[in-house]
C-alpha cells in the first residue's frame, strides 16, 4: 500500500523537476535548477526573436533577403529550442535542447556581424543593442548548458 513510484515532468520554461508520488496521491517536488534564471533566459530569447523578426522585415523591404533569411531562421530558433526544452524527456534531452539553442545563438551572432561588416545594416544604438542581447543570451546559455551537463 505504501509503494512509491517516480516520474519526470518539465514544469516551466527551462525548469526540470522530479516528483515522488505515493499511491494515496500526495506529491513531493524537488527542483533542480534556478527557476528565476530560466525564466529570464526564456523571456530574453523571445524578446530577441521578436526584434530579429522586425530586423528581417526591414531588410526584406530593402531587398536584402539572403542573409536576412538565415538570421531569421537561427534567431527565432533560439527561443524555440528553449521552449522545447520545457518538455524534454530526460536530463540528457534537456541539455541537448539547450546546446542546440546555444549553437543557434552563435550562428545568429555570426549573421549579425556579417550584416554589420558588409554594411547591409548601419551600426546604430538599436542594432548594437540587438548584438549585445545576442552576446548576453550566448553567455546565459553557456552557463545553463554547463549546469545541465553537470547534472546528467
Please give the residue ranges for each predicted region.
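Short, C-terminally biased terminal segments at protein or domain edges
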Residues: 1-80, 84, 88-152
